């Protein structure tokens, strides 16, 4: 049988398709380099995230005045007027599931420290409507001062990334501790006790 040009072209095409279908293998060195590059990118990404989480974690706490809900006595609370006390500022919202989980713990801590007079627990309602906020306060039997963060002035000053977030302000007016998630009564009480001891 003689070989025609058509048979050669068909064979060449089949060989070319086979060559294209065969996966290319990476050398072990290339794999190691890729792993190192990905690890470095991960570390850099985490550092960027931490750098952008710029909540105050020390130094003077941003001052503010909060209008307290009428259902909790009304009036205002100004941070700078309460120097000499440990102030626990909890940012929350009625639509926040983790906030609902920690609400009983916050009330428990307030009941434990309220009579001392040198500890204040303050709730700052974040991006919420008054009706839902008041229903939340009633549902959890909250008695410590709470008010709406009108125009997100306070949460902006504290660079809130989400809720719940809690700041413990020392007697000197500086941020003593920042808590980036829900908190238990036991953990919060331990932080307050350390702040009181300073």
Predicted regions and their residues:
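Thiol/disulfide oxidoreductase modules built on the thioredoxin-like
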Residues: 135-143, 148-197
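Soluble periplasmic/extracytoplasmic beta-strand elements of cell-envelope proteins
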Residues: 87-90, 121-125, 167, 178-179
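Conserved hydrophobic/aromatic "anchor" residues
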Residues: 64, 77, 91-92, 136, ...
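Short active-site neighborhood of thiol/selenol oxidoreductases, capturing the structured segment around
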Residues: 77-100, 121
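A short beta-strand-turn-helix
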Residues: 65-87, 110-113
